[in-house]
Each structure stands twice: as C-alpha cells, then as structure tokens.
Amino acid sequence: MTKQAGKTRDVGFVFGLRKTFPLSVQQAWDFMFSKQGLGIWLGELTTDFELQKSYSTQEGIEGVVRVLKPDSHIRMGWKKESWTNMSTVQVRFIAKGADKTVISFLHEKLTGAQQRAEMKEYWNQKMDLITKALDAMGN
C-alpha cells in the first residue's frame, strides 16, 4: 500500500510550508499581525481577531483563534465559505539567530488529497505575497 502525500493517522491530510526571512522574530510577528500582514495571509477581517473568539474575513474565511502566543505561534480553526469541514492552521515563528526567522504554516485536518492540493497552491501564493511585501519594505 502506498502512502499518500500529507496523510497522517491523527489529523487527516496536512500541508506545511516554511520560509526563512532576514528579520528578528519580533519583526516577523509584528509584520504578520499588522493590518497589511493579516490582509495578506488571512484576509481582510470583518470581526475582531482575539484569543478564544470567532473571526471572519471578507474573503469568506472563518474560524476561532485557539492559541495566541506573541512572537511564537498562533493556532486557529480555519474554514473556507465553500467547505463543510473546519480545519486547523498554525503559524509559527522560529528564530534562526538574531536576524533570521522561519515563518511556518501548517494546515491540518484537510479532508483529502484534493483539499491538500488546493491548500498547497493557496499557501504558496500567500508566501509569495508575504515575500514580495517584505522585499518592498527592504527586508
């Protein structure tokens, strides 16, 4: 039996993506949770974005912020408007020295290979937009 890419025993299908940026963890965190940064990777919020609260975006993403540890990570429910399932997204900030940080996206509880492929394309596009925005800021 061949193992399917991204299939786990415990959390269904997953997709992960990470990239190192020439920023401190605090700089990376501050950008990703600024209005511009949130707009890129999460969308334009139509609600407050707070721990243990539901959120929604103009793009039709909704969920609940479950864990929020500044300069470390966020874990939240994440659902597209067209989906029947609630998935989980975790964004981590990992220091690689004083001025380098890995920004890591892990998307769990995807329903299958098709949803994983959709999210692979989605998060790669988001990472490209994050990179372009940071490059434009001189980072």
Q: Residue ranges of each PLM-predicted region?
A:
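Hydrophobic ligand-binding cavity/cleft-lining segments
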Residues: 1-46
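Short, charged low-complexity linear motifs
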Residues: 14-16, 26-27, 103-111, 135
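Tryptophan-centric aromatic hotspots in well-structured domains and transmembrane helices
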Residues: 29-32, 41, 78, 122-123, ...
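Hydrophobic-ligand binding "helix-grip"
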Residues: 39, 46-47, 54-111
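A conserved amphipathic terminal alpha-helix motif
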Residues: 108-139
